[in-house]
């Protein structure tokens, strides 16, 4: 029997009604109340997520920048201390190793945040390509991560932080902030399409912080949220999930995150030739939004057709809690990717009519 990994918050899930599932080898809460309720809380008030299963890797040393420039697609040289950057790591053929965040904590000090399912693979990938005076250390077990997301997130977090959170702009962070007396890195980032913060602290401090935030946020409607709502929220905002929109067979350009690929940077990074070609001349496939016109919900790997020709497949799909529509993301032949193109999705051996629609499905009003 496989023993599932647990985050430092596992013991407090039950107190808040958490229902756990096996998520890539981790025992994590899929929901606390209901996915719909938690989803709506984040869109209208605020939600608190345990994201401690994510991986953290420290990269330090004189050659840390040169090393990162070689292994990621974005231009890390543009990052200033206190800044965060979204990027990807690719194989030589352009397929994706992982998507990740890089935090620049010092001139020779970077924190990489990687997907839970890829921690070992990513660490080995990074370690095998180290150059010069750069060190790569997996600190995942020492670090916990909480995400507070939603329009009321700032006001709630401000109650337990003395620094003015308005000073932390989007994709910026402050290190060594005290959150209710607990040292943490606080960044204005997230995976929901809403404003919010991600808080990195020592594993042993996570449970205390979780309970304190839920206590001070109760009045504003802060709810504990599970993986179910995290997925529907990121999906509506058209944020890719590794293993679905991104994989070793899908490039960042195909997946719609070409903005994180900088083929004109000087460094010769893995996948550069393929990604440069795709950015300049277009990729053969494109990730598009689809709305199902008839009954049925598109799910991962459901085939997409025009007539008898299979043109691609669904990567993610759901009944959108915000839009009240059955929608999906599909990776299809670029020839058919224009908005308003009529397609069919095979749902349980039956062809169902759908149409290509613009993405993101949801964008918050500023």
Swiss-Prot record:
The glycine cleavage system catalyzes the degradation of glycine. HAMAP family: GcvT (MF_00259). The glycine cleavage system is composed of four proteins: P, T, L and H. It catalyses: N(6)-[(R)-S(8)-aminomethyldihydrolipoyl]-L-lysyl-[protein] + (6S)-5,6,7,8-tetrahydrofolate = N(6)-[(R)-dihydrolipoyl]-L-lysyl-[protein] + (6R)-5,10-methylene-5,6,7,8-tetrahydrofolate + NH4(+). Belongs to the GcvT family. It holds the Pfam family GCV_T_C. Transmembrane segments: none annotated. It comes from the Bacteria. It is an enzyme of class 2 (transferase). This is Aminomethyltransferase. PANTHER family: AMINOMETHYLTRANSFERASE, AMINOMETHYLTRANSFERASE, MITOCHONDRIAL. Its EC number is 2.1.2.10. Gene3D superfamilies: Aminomethyltransferase beta-barrel domains, Aminomethyltransferase fragment, Probable tRNA modification gtpase trme, domain 1. Disulfide bonds: none annotated. GO terms for biological process: glycine decarboxylation via glycine cleavage system. InterPro entries: GCS_T, GCS_T_bac, GCST_C, GCV_T_N, GcvT/YgfZ/DmdA, GcvT/YgfZ_C, TrmE/GcvT_dom1. Keywords: Aminotransferase, Transferase. GO terms for cellular component: cytosol; glycine cleavage complex. The gene is gcvT. One of its GO terms (molecular function) is aminomethyltransferase activity. It comes from Bacillus cereus (strain AH187).
């Amino acid at each position: 029997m496989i023993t599932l990994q647990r985050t430092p918050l596992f013991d407090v899930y039950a107190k808040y009604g958490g229902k756990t599932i096996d998520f890539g080898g981790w025992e994590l809460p899929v929901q606390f109340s209901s996915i719909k309720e938690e989803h709506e809380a984040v869109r209208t008030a605020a939600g608190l997520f345990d994201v401690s299963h994510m991986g953290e890797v420290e990269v330090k040393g004189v050659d840390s920048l040169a090393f990162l420039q070689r292994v990621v697609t974005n231009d890390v040289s543009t990052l200033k201390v206190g800044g965060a950057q979204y990027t990807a790591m690719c194989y030589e053929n352009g397929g994706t190793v992982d998507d990740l965040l890089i935090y620049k904590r010092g001139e020779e000090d970077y924190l990489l945040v990687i997907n839970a399912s890829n921690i070992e693979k990513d660490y080995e990938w990074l370690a095998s390509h180290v150059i010069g005076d750069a060190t790569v250390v997996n600190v995942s077990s020492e670090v916990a991560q909480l995400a507070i997301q939603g329009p009321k997130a700032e006001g709630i977090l401000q109650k337990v932080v003395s620094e003015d959170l308005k000073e932390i702009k989007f994709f910026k962070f402050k290190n060594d902030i005290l959150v209710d007396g607990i040292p943490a890195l606080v960044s204005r980032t997230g995976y929901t399409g809403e404003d919010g913060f991600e808080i990195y602290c020592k594993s042993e401090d996570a449970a205390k912080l979780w309970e304190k935030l839920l206590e001070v946020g109760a009045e504003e409607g802060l709810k504990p949220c599970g993986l179910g709502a995290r997925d529907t929220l990121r999906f509506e905002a058209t944020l890719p999930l590794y293993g679905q929109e991104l994989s070793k067979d899908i490039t960042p350009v195909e997946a719609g995150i070409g903005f994180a690929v900088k083929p004109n940077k000087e460094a010769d990074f893995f996948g550069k030739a393929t990604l440069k070609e795709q950015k300049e001349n277009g990729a053969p496939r494109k990730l598009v939004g689809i709305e199902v016109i008839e009954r049925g919900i598109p799910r991962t790997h459901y085939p997409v057709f025009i007539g008898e020709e299979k043109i691609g497949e669904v990567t993610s799909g759901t009944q959108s809690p915000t839009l009240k529509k059955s929608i999906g993301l599909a990776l299809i032949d670029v020839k058919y990717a224009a908005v308003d193109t009529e397609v069919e999705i095979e749902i349980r051996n039956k062809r169902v009519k759908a149409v290509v629609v613009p993405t993101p499905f949801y964008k918050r009003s500023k």
